[in-house]
Amino acid sequence: MKALNVPTIDFVGKRTYAIVFSVVLIAVSIFSLATQGLKFGIDFTGGTLIEVGYKKSVDLSKVRDTLSDAKFKGANVQYFGSTNEILIRLEPQAISSAKLSTKIIRLLGDDVDIRRVEFVGPKVGEELTNDGGLAMLYALIGILIYVAFRFEYRFSLGSISALMHDVIITLGIFSLLQIEFDLTVLAAILAVIGYSLNDTIVVFDRIRENFLSTRHVDPEKIINGALNQTLSRTIMTSVTTLIVLLALFFLGGEIIHSFALALLIGVIIGTYSSIYVASSMILTM
């Protein structure tokens, strides 16, 4: 099998443009997060989750209109598994689960089947928010320690900068578009951290090898060479991952749209940051 030719793209020479692009994205993301925040789902805000079954396919718009007319503001309705099963997310209600189920049946018709009713209290939602934030913090600290031991402090700070870059921009896009942020999206963010780190470490490994094998050469040339040598691997890994994620997004159903979207955004941003952000931080330090 014929080996692929190593490209000679001047990534390092274009790092100024990349830094400006990243700074703009981060600034917009932070501004959006500070002004309008994330649109948290009931996993974090508290509320009621109701799974409803129908004997035949149901029109979601009619269900939404029915709930809206009954003063259930902010009700989220989506298919769950098939077009005759729906999932309803409601804001916290001042009535019991039994009374709420009775009210929903009265609104939607006697032929519906209430499969389950789950209540998430505001306190539980607050605990999940705190735990989610701590999970990301612990992940970043663990990565900082791991990379510092495996490489050196410059590599460690470079990897953390790239990961924070990926997380902030992904959260910023969710804030800008006001896409619901629930536990599945949090799981996707943590997965993005792992994916981006793996990509970055592959690049760092090659940079370290090149520094050890090539003496008295401009660091920019060494890093540029490493980025070009790992480029085919980076592109092939990202493209195959994106193909799977696109299939999940378009064919996986509405229930996992946010999860798949977070991964799509994270993989694209993570691939970009492993090439430009992480390596730029090494040169800066």
Region roles according to the model:
Residues 1-285:
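A structural signal for conserved, well-ordered secondary-structure elements
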